[in-house]
Every structure is written in C-alpha cells, then in structure tokens.
Amino acid sequence: MDVTIQHPWFKRALGPFYHNRLFDQFFGEGLFEYDLLPFQSLFRTVLDSGISEVRSDRDQFLILLDHFSPEDLTVKVLDDFVEIHGKHNERQDDHGYISREFHRRYRLPSNVDKSALSCSLSADGMLTFCGPKVQSGMDASHSERAIPVSREEKASSAPNS
C-alpha cells in the first residue's frame, strides 16, 4: 500500500477529530491500515484511544488513564504536579521486540488537598487518580511524596463525558 505524506496544515483542518495511534498508549504495537486514513479515526472513541482524561469540578480533581497494570506504574506528587511514570518491559512479538515507557505530568489545582490524594487501578486497567478540593484559604505542604496504586477487583465504572 502506497502512503502519501500529508503536510501538517491539512491535518489541522480536522482538529481534535484526527486521531493518530503514534501518540497514544498503543505506541509500539504496530499500525493498521485504518490508522493511516484520517477519516477512519473520526469513528473511534476516546476510550479506545488510550488518551488520558482530566476532570475538575467543584468537589474533586480526577485523572483517568487506561491500559495499565500496577507493576507498570509509579505515581508521585512533587510540589504542584502529579507525575505518572509507566514502563512496559521488553517483550517479543511477531515483528521483533517491543519496549514502551511514558512519563506524564499534570498540574494540580491549587485548592486540592495533597495529603488526601488517592490512586486506584480497576480490574480492566483504568487508573483513577483523585483528590478532594478544599477551601481556598487552606494550603497543603509542598513536598515530594509517592502515591501507592491500590488494585480494585471490579471493572471501572467511569462515565463517558
């Protein structure tokens, strides 16, 4: 199959609807023909893409990530940031060896209680990082601290937005 190279300007016209598997959690697993067709990606869901979701409402701050196991993840809070590091060890597949690693950093809102942060992983691999919000006058200390990832026995029930 011949593949033409598109100038980035043409992809911009589709904006957030243009999904590229090269930049999601499936990186390193190979591309399918439909990944090279821009309009095919319009029909894929966000949950299928491995893209993280950040929610912040009046009561809590929430980060949702998927496709992980607890052994792959390290979660820590450093000052006003949550750092999530994941590493899949090298394994062999039909085409050679695959090794994946990622590092994501999210800024915490200033009114999140850093001493009450929690992190859990559902049975279907959905990581949920949650922190309650406090009144604006209260401020937690600024230091580095690891957040343990607890494992849930049931699948996630995170609603789609």
From Swiss-Prot:
Main subcellular localisation: cytoplasm
Protein name: Alpha-crystallin A chain
Glycosylation sites: S150
Subunit text: Heteromer composed of three CRYAA and one CRYAB subunits. Inter-subunit bridging via zinc ions enhances stability, which is crucial as there is no protein turn over in the lens. Can also form homodimers and homotetramers (dimers of dimers) which serve as the building blocks of homooligomers. Within homooligomers, the zinc-binding motif is created from residues of 3 different molecules. His-88 and Glu-90 from one molecule are ligands of the zinc ion, and His-95 and His-142 residues from additional molecules complete the site with tetrahedral coordination geometry.
Residues binding Zn(2+) 3, per UniProt: H142
Positions carrying N-acetylmethionine: M1
Organism: Trichechus inunguis (Amazon manatee)
GO CC annotations, alphabetized: cytoplasm; nucleus
Binding site for Zn(2+) 2: H95
Region of interest (Disordered), residue spans: 135-161
Modified residues (Phosphoserine): S110
InterPro entries to which the protein is assigned, alphabetical: A-crystallin/Hsp20_dom (IPR002068), Alpha-crystallin/sHSP_animal (IPR001436), Alpha-crystallin_N (IPR003090), HSP20-like_chaperone (IPR008978)
Chain positions with N6-acetyllysine modification: K87
Modified residues (Deamidated asparagine): N89, N111
